């Protein structure tokens, strides 16, 4: 008889790391979708603030959106790397790469978790003391993160968005052809169709004049 008790393979640290990578991949995929919604909300907030003539806050919203878009690019690249590693049949021999990806994944999750709160978008719109403190803190943080090139591109985005809103807010030109107005009808008396008949008095007067003798 064969051995009925088959020894289970030992789970290695690499196996655990691979499982963690898969878990991270799933979480980051969910966070990506949430962050995309936040980015859209930031853009809408910038549009609203431009309409309200609040340039400083609109620029702050666009700056925050820029950093979030950069974070999305980093997460996308990390996910691509993980997919390549998980598809590699020799993955178990690349322990260093696995643990490095796991470390990067943890950092990515921490970074993206702090950016997926839609309530923070509303703080850009509010005028409360709490919102003002948040705006000042965010402005200081973004000032350190963004380069001069980023600042120029954000200003260009602001100008472009402002121009688009001016066009959007213009009154619409009617597309249907205007029909000419019909002239107003006036109630006039009917035109007589027969010659007028003189009265008897008028006829007698004319006859009398004709019958009177002319003076010598």
UniProtKB/Swiss-Prot annotation:
UniProt keyword annotation of Protein transport present: yes
Membrane topology: Lipid-anchor
Organism: Arabidopsis thaliana
Gene Ontology biological process terms, A to Z: intralumenal vesicle formation; protein transport; vacuolar transport
Family: Belongs to the SNF7 family.
Main function: Component of the ESCRT-III complex, which is required for multivesicular bodies (MVBs) formation and sorting of endosomal cargo proteins into MVBs. The ESCRT-III complex is probably involved in the concentration of MVB cargo.
Subcellular location: Endosome membrane
Source taxon at top rank: Eukaryota
Coarse class of the protein's main subcellular location: membrane
GO cellular component entries: cytosol; ESCRT III complex; late endosome; plasma membrane
InterPro entries in the cross-refs: Snf7_fam
Stretches of the chain forming a coiled coil according to its record: 16-90
Protein's name according to its UniProt entry: Vacuolar protein sorting-associated protein 20 homolog 2
Entry annotated with the keyword Flavoprotein: no
Stretches the record annotates as Disordered: 173-216
Designated gene of the protein: VPS20.2
Keywords: Coiled coil, Endosome, Lipoprotein, Membrane, Myristate, Protein transport, Transport
UniProt-listed PANTHER family: CHARGED MULTIVESICULAR BODY PROTEIN (PTHR22761), CHARGED MULTIVESICULAR BODY PROTEIN 6 (PTHR22761:SF5)
Residue numbers with lipid attached (N-myristoyl glycine): 2
Subunit (UniProt): Component of the endosomal sorting required for transport complex III (ESCRT-III), composed at least of VPS2, VPS20, VPS24 and VPS32. Interacts with SKD1.
């Amino acid at each position: 008889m064969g051995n009925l008790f088959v020894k289970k393979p030992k789970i290695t640290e690499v196996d655990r790391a691979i499982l963690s990578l898969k878990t991270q991949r799933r979480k980051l995929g969910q966070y990506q979708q949430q962050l995309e919604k936040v980015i859209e909300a930031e853009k809408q907030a910038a549009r609203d603030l431009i309409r309200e003539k609040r340039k400083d806050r609109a620029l702050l919203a666009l700056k925050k959106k820029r950093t979030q878009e950069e974070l999305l690019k980093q997460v996308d690249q990390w996910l691509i790397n993980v997919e390549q590693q998980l598809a590699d049949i020799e993955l178990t021999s690349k322990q260093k790469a696995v643990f490095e990806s796991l470390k990067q994944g943890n950092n990515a999750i921490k970074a993206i978790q702090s950016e997926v709160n839609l309530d923070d978008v509303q703080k850009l719109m509010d005028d409360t003391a709490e919102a003002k403190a948040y705006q000042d803190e965010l402005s200081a943080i973004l000032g350190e993160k963004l380069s001069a090139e980023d600042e120029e591109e954000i200003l260009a985005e602001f100008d472009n968005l402002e121009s688009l809103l001016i066009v959007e807010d213009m009154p619409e030109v009617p597309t249907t052809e205007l029909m000419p107005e019909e002239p107003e009808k006036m109630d006039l008396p009917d035109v007589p169709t027969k010659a007028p008949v003189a009265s008897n008095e008028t006829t007698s007067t004319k006859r009398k004049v004709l019958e009177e003798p002319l003076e010598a």
